[in-house]
Amino acid sequence: MVFLAAPGTSQDPPKSSEFVFARVQFTQRRWTHIWPELRDNPNSAGPPWWHDYPKSDRFVTGLLQELTRVRTDPTSFHNVELENPEIFNYPFLYFSEPGFMNLNDQEVANLGEYIRRGGFVMADDFREPGIFRIVGEMTDEFEVFRHYLSRAVPEYRLVRLDLSHPIFHQFFDIATLDMDPPYGDFRPQFWGLVDEHGKLHGIADYNNDLGDYWEDLDQGEALVRPAVWSTQLGINYVLYAMSH
């Protein structure tokens, strides 16, 4: 059983933008939250792919404009569907809550082609069983993500990253990966999607939710230190993707 994703309110990004933050819109699996008001009304917080939109997208692109030489602005974000060939126009795809994805064969094929062409994927806001549970044959959100990647790019593999990887020093010099997630008592892990030559094609923020920090940092509603780290990580990810 699946729920159709609610339509987004994504606008067309400015044609002058060098970088567009492309968020993947997907059909979701049946899902259950521990909170009754969300369990009984799954769309009360929006579909999983929508979480933290559009504030987090606007915040990251705005900071890229202010802190780097990348030509972009706070309106340079866009929602995309994997079935649409427009994904090949964007070097960076952002997945929110990928543990709830329900991809069809064409979406899987396009995702594989996108990655092989050099596109970079970022997976965020998913975690080990505890807060959320998927009803179905796969219950661990990471395994759902791994499942689709193994179909899309079976020759690639997910590896645990440590602080020595260049992505953590691309623009900001990240001092530690030991950070607190915005909620829960999970311990964040950083996983990379690498090809047979060890080249990095994507990163997964497991047991973490950088987008949640991005959404709230300028509102004074987030813990300052991990929120700053999460923003630095996001900018590093984008610049790494654009330069590799």
Where are the predicted features?
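Surface-exposed patches in mature extracellular/periplasmic domains of secreted proteins
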Residues: 70-80, 123-127, 155-164
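Extracytoplasmic/secreted envelope proteins and their assembly/folding machinery
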Residues: 57, 61, 108, 112, ...
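Alpha-helical scaffolding within the catalytic cores
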Residues: 75-82, 104-110, 185-189
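Bacterial N-terminal signal peptides
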Residues: 1-4
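Short alpha-beta junction capping motif
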Residues: 21, 87, 92-133
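Aromatic-Pro/Gly-enriched surface loop or interdomain linker
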Residues: 10-92, 98-99, 209-210, 216-244
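Alpha/beta-hydrolase-fold catalytic nucleophile elbow
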Residues: 24, 124, 206
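An acidic, glycine-rich "communication" segment
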Residues: 29-37, 128-216, 226, 230-231, ...
